[in-house]
Structure formats: C-alpha cells, structure tokens
Design a protein with these regions (language model features):
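Outer-membrane beta-barrel "beta-signal"
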Residues: 165-176, 191-205
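Detector for outer-membrane/organellar transmembrane beta-barrel domains
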Residues: 91-155
C-alpha cells in the first residue's frame, strides 16, 4: 500500500517566534500545518496566530520545495510566500523568500546551514538575508538537544544576531515537546528582541 502523501501537524506554544524574535507579544500561539510529499518534491501550508505592532494577527506560509542528497549532504531548496493577515492598510504584508538548507552528520553531531533571502521583506524592509548554523546531538532515541546561531542583515530593517538552545523530546509516535531559550544581541530594539523561554507541544497526524 502506498504511503499517504499528506501529513498534518497541530501545535501550541507559549509564544510564536520567527527568525529569533517573539511574534505574538508574549502570548500563547496555536498553529497548524499540512504537507504534501511526492519523492523529493513537497508543498506545505502553515499558519499560526501572531500579534505584531503593525496589526498582524496571524502569519501564513505557503512553501514549495525539493529535497535531495549530493555527495553526502542533504539539500533542501524552497520558495516561501509569507502573508500576515490583519496588517494595517498601506503596509506591505506579503512577500516571498528563497531558502536553501544544507545538512550533514559528523559523528554524533547533526549540522545544518540555512541561507534565506528576500528582495522585498515585511513592511519597509527591502533586501534581507538570514544565515543560520544549527547543530544537534541525540541524547537518546527520543530526545535531541540543539543549538543555533544566525545573523540577520536587512536594508531598511534591523540587523541583529540571534541564537537559541533547547531540547526536543518525542513523547510517542505523535506528540513531541520542545523547551527552548531564544535571545539576540539587540535588546535595545524592543521587547521582541529580548531573551525568552518558549515551550511548545506538537501533534503529528
């Protein structure tokens, strides 16, 4: 029997985060995602509740991509459309990102390099880059510790460095929990750039 090409995930978190920043004004967020996979190709639709100063009350990501392996490296190339419903009139709240992930395991350490680019970002932000390096180690069959550090550069936007460290544990085949600390080097930019501890629960179907 052929595997179902569709998968679903529901989630709840103590706060919605994105690119190292708080995006739900320190309030809980719920999310959902549906993914279609066929061979290396995939498409997904993700939505989460948010609360941004520009009035946005949600974020919706529509992604198409392709995964493959080249010389021992896992490659994931994707195009992402971001839309932020509820944003005040006159603010650019829909934009497209281009993303490339390269991953490889070195002994017990799993690594991933991510490069994300847009030529016209949210609100007044224009060209922007997000470059992130992540590493993780399996503590046991159900638990993995990971850490990541990233640089954000943006024309007409804020430049900052972000990092996170945390532990994810599978409770069973469907439920998983994640406890993670997020922080940046620019607390002077506002509360969303300050350090925060985020707990999340996901259900995979």
């Amino acid at each position: 029997m052929a595997a179902d090409p569709f998968s679903f995930q529901l989630g709840v978190a103590s706060e919605y985060t994105g690119k190292g920043l708080g995006k739900s004004d320190e309030q809980p967020s719920v999310s959902g995602q549906v993914t279609w996979t066929q061979g290396g190709a995939y498409a997904s639709l993700f939505g989460a509740t948010a609360d941004l100063p520009q009035g946005s009350d949600a974020e919706i990501l529509t992604t198409i991509g392709y995964r493959t392996t080249v010389s021992g490296y896992g490659l994931d190339l994707s195009v992402i459309n971001r839309d932020l419903p509820g944003t005040r009139s006159g603010i650019d709240a829909n934009y497209t990102e281009f993303q490339a992930d390269a991953s490889r395991t070195f002994g017990p350490v799993a690594t991933r390099l991510r490069v994300n680019y847009t030529d016209d970002g949210f609100a007044g932000t224009k060209e922007a880059w997000w470059v992130e390096l992540q590493g993780g180690v399996a503590i046991n069959a159900a638990t993995k510790a990971t850490a990541a550090i990233a640089d954000r550069t943006a024309r007409n936007g804020n430049d900052y460095r972000a990092w996170n460290v945390g532990v994810k544990r599978k409770l069973d085949d469907r439920f998983a929990v994640d406890l993670r600390w997020y922080d940046t080097d620019r607390h002077d930019f506002g509360e969303s750039y300050e350090g925060r501890l985020v707990a999340a629960l996901t259900l995979s179907l």
